[in-house]
Amino acid sequence: MKKLVLAALLASFTFGASAAEKINFGVSATYPPFESIGANNEIVGFDIDLAKALCKQMQAECTFTNHAFDSLIPSLKFRKYDAVISGMDITPERSKQVSFTTPYYENSAVVIAKKDTYKTFADLKGKRIGMENGTTHQKYIQDQHPEVKTVSYDSYQNAFIDLKNGRIDGVFGDTAVVNEWLKTNPQLGVATEKVTDPQYFGTGLGIAVRPDNKALLEKLNNALAAIKADGTYQKISDQWFPQ
């Protein structure tokens, strides 16, 4: 009898383990503090910890695939992963291709440059401003400030390196991200007003899924609501965005 009970328990455990849902998230790990490659060559960041908390709430297993930002939505559509969490603004244009969860982070953007050099976008006429290719920052500058010379990069990290070395005049990125750079680079400062244009920066950051994956979208939204209610979200936010 004991053997039968043990066998039944083992079978139940094996079934439960194999039945756990696996969710593969596409990320572009070049954008700290949202996502970047850590000391142990692991992907770390606010988005990563958030995704892990969501998976724990859903009793699912998380994995992450690192791709260039401008390939994330095409790769999602080709089913290379189940969802994208990568500091991605919810915009009308993107919403034509993918479905987004409710916003998980309010967003704004700003240009940083050598301290006390510029004050507004009007001061940037003819200046070389770096940004990551395929981002809403790039589209905003191209559409709204064509007088600015856009310099596209495969990652914001490379843009920031060029800014420090004087090869470009500024970098346009999310406020939370550039604030991290400013903490360790006192020679730099905010060079423009904050931008929150909903046409480009939407209603915040969201997790993208394929439009036909309504089940996953619902699970993610429910899990997001749950971790906000129980304080988990705030703990993660406080860790990565200390006041």
From Swiss-Prot:
Residue ranges the record marks as coiled coil: none
Compartment annotation: Periplasm
CDD domains hit by this protein: PBP2_Arg_STM4351 (cd13700)
Gene Ontology terms: cellular component: ATP-binding cassette (ABC) transporter complex, substrate-binding subunit-containing; membrane; outer membrane-bounded periplasmic space; periplasmic space
Organism taxonomic ancestry: Bacteria, Pseudomonadati, Pseudomonadota, Gammaproteobacteria, Enterobacterales
One matching Pfam family: SBP_bac_3
Subunit organization: The complex is composed of two ATP-binding proteins (ArtP), two transmembrane proteins (ArtM and ArtQ) and two solute-binding proteins (ArtJ and ArtI).
Signal peptide: 1-19
GO MF, one example: amino acid binding
Homology family: Belongs to the bacterial solute-binding protein 3 family.
Gene that this sequence comes from: artJ
Entry keywords, A to Z: Amino-acid transport, Periplasm, Signal, Transport
GO terms under biological process: L-arginine import across plasma membrane; L-arginine transmembrane transport
Primary role: Part of the ABC transporter complex ArtPIQMJ involved in arginine transport. Binds L-arginine with high affinity.
Name used for this protein in its record: ABC transporter arginine-binding protein 1
Listed NCBIfam families: 3A0103s03R, ArtJ_Ecoli, PRK15007.1
